Amino acid sequence: MTTLAIDIGGTKLAAALIGADGQIRDRRELPTPASQTPQALRDALAALVAPLQAHAQQVAIASTGIIRDGSLLALNPHNLGGLLHFPLVKTLEQLSNLPTIAINDAQAAAWAEYQALEGDITDMVFITVSTGVGGGVVSGGKLLTGPSGLAGHIGHTLADPHGPVCGCGRTGCVEAIASGRGIAAAAQGELMGADARTIFTRAGQGDEQAQQLIHRSAHVLARLIADIKATTDCQCVVVGGSVGLAEGYLALVKTYLAQEPAAFHVDLLAAHYRHDAGLLGAALLAQGEKL
């Protein structure tokens, strides 16, 4: 059975056909609409899936935000241009005339990355550092979603009680500091207004402020990972996302994690499926892998 997998992120929308063999075909991308109107997202999704839907038997959506009863509920609306709510499953069933499931994107990615691990691993955590910071938890070989879909939203745990206000309404969240949006928001002087990609480029060129911003992000993430180890006793943490996979970033996180007491150390791995983990995880779940 072929699955039309869709990944809805804060920066881009992606779609692909994924067969039972896990192979990705006909991958396509569009920018995520920076609009508070549901119609803008619906129109973008319609354009994305139209060339693919005739070749699939089902649809699987991996989306940022809390997924509850088939709908997207934005924990941080800024990540989707201010959009608060969107009926994912209903919309895609109308657009494609195919049975549809939806799951949080980091939860989906966690499931795909768990399947790729070697050895006797039953407990792992996936962290994506991108526009926002999200996560997925596998415990005892089972993906945790929680009764309301909130499980794994580790980007909204506390990093600094005196830090910036997060889009979720809390103060000092990990996401508000460590994410691509958080890195960019903290930039000053000649870097003010630059996006995270530009800041990473400038850091590679020796810009001191850019390097400090990236170190700050990596340090916050390392402390989060130590907290996760204390909470879950996971055997490994897999890091993905555009920031998480940026050159040199994971090495920085490892350096800061090594400064924590040994009890909180855990193996850190780069995402095996890189930017396709959400698509693959959603397809796996739609094709019969159990939560």
Curated annotation (Swiss-Prot):
Assembly and binders: Homodimer.
GO annotation terms (biological process): N-acetylneuraminate catabolic process
Domain of life where this protein originates: Bacteria
GO molecular function: ATP binding; N-acylmannosamine kinase activity; zinc ion binding
Keywords: ATP-binding, Carbohydrate metabolism, Kinase, Metal-binding, Nucleotide-binding, Transferase, Zinc
Membrane-traversing stretches: none
Binding site for ATP: 5-12, 132-139
EC number(s) given by UniProt: 2.7.1.60
One of the Pfam families matching this protein, by short name: ROK
Annotated binding of Zn(2+), by residue: H156, C166, C168, C173
Known pathway: Amino-sugar metabolism; N-acetylneuraminate degradation; D-fructose 6-phosphate from N-acetylneuraminate: step 2/5
Function: Catalyzes the phosphorylation of N-acetylmannosamine (ManNAc) to ManNAc-6-P.
Catalyzed reaction equations: an N-acyl-D-mannosamine + ATP = an N-acyl-D-mannosamine 6-phosphate + ADP + H(+)
Family indicated by similarity: Belongs to the ROK (NagC/XylR) family. NanK subfamily.
Entries under PANTHER family matching the protein: N-ACETYLMANNOSAMINE KINASE, ROK (REPRESSOR, ORF, KINASE) FAMILY
EC category: transferase
InterPro entries named in the record: ATPase_NBD, ManNAc_kinase_bac, ROK, ROK_cs
Protein name: N-acetylmannosamine kinase
